[in-house]
Each structure stands twice: as C-alpha cells, then as structure tokens.
Amino acid sequence: MELKEKIRVIDGFPKEGISFKDITTLLNDKDAYKYAVDLMVDDLKDKGITAIAAPEARGFLFGSAVAYALGVRFIPVRKPGKLPGEVSEYSYDLEYGTDKLEVHRDAIKKGDKVAIVDDLLATGGTVNAVAKLIEKNGGEITAMEFLIELTELGGRDINKNYYINTLVQYES
C-alpha cells in the first residue's frame, strides 16, 4: 500500500504558500491507518522500548496505537495547564517567542527507553523539546517515529543524534 496516496494535500491551507498534508483521509481508511501503525510497530519492536511518548494532539493518534500494539506505556506530552497534579516542564524557543511542554512527573522512570511518535516531522523543534523533556526526567530516547516528513524544513538536522524513521516524505 502506498501511504502517500492516502494523504490529501491541500494547497493554500491554512494560508497561501502552505501545502497542508491532511491525514484525516488516511485515518478514515481503516486499512491505511492500520498499515501505518503496523509499519511503525515493526520498526520499533526490537528496540527494547519501555514507553512511547507523543505530543498532543495528532501524536496521540499514532502514539497510543503503537504503545498498545507494543504492550508498553503511553506518555502523553501536553501543552501547559492540561495535566493535573505534579508536572515536569521544558521550555523551548520558537521563531517568535517560546513554548512549553509538560508531562506528569511520575510518567518517566529513570532508564526508560522511550520512542517518540508523532504525525509530522517539519522543523523538528517540537520533537526535540519532547526528547529534552524525556531526558531531563531520566529517560533515554531510543527512536523518533513519524508518519510524514517535510524534508526541506530540516527536522532531521536538529535531531541528528537520534534514530529517526518516517513513513512518507514530501519536499515541502
């Protein structure tokens, strides 16, 4: 199955000059969705992973399914103020300001081997922040797994010290 054929491309959304990759068409095709998850699972199954971490919101769509299939814990990585109780946070720079990500303080165990799963690798800033947050709390990043990679945006460059696998690549 060619996953790229299952992703709708919408030029000019959300604004001119953007070519939006709409994964809802893939999600609405049960065979394509299962195939994408199975490919991620196959890539990760022999890496000794103890947990999957995924940033909200679309990362949850793949991360939780992969965690379930591998029989490992799922760690939701959220925006500030979305998790009750004690959290650990990591701030990172954006082009025009800063942003922050949080996890429950007890979600990551020292020595955990964590794979980060998300729908899209673009500039790599968000996944890099997730990695730093996991490492700050004693986890080890074993892999980064994505449905889509926008290769021209250089997300691999700032994450070059991590293993990265992507299922579909676009230049832009």
UniProtKB/Swiss-Prot annotation:
The keyword Cytoplasm applies. It is an enzyme of class 2 (transferase). GO terms for biological process: adenine salvage; AMP salvage; purine ribonucleoside salvage. It catalyses: AMP + diphosphate = 5-phospho-alpha-D-ribose 1-diphosphate + adenine. Pathway: Purine metabolism; AMP biosynthesis via salvage pathway; AMP from adenine: step 1/1. Keywords: Cytoplasm, Glycosyltransferase, Purine salvage, Transferase. It comes from the Bacteria. InterPro entries: Ade_phspho_trans, Adenine_PRTase, PRibTrfase_dom, PRTase-like. Its EC number is 2.4.2.7. GO terms for cellular component: cytoplasm. Its main location: cytoplasm. Belongs to the purine/pyrimidine phosphoribosyltransferase family. This is Adenine phosphoribosyltransferase. It comes from Finegoldia magna (strain ATCC 29328 / DSM 20472 / WAL 2508) (Peptostreptococcus magnus). The gene is apt.
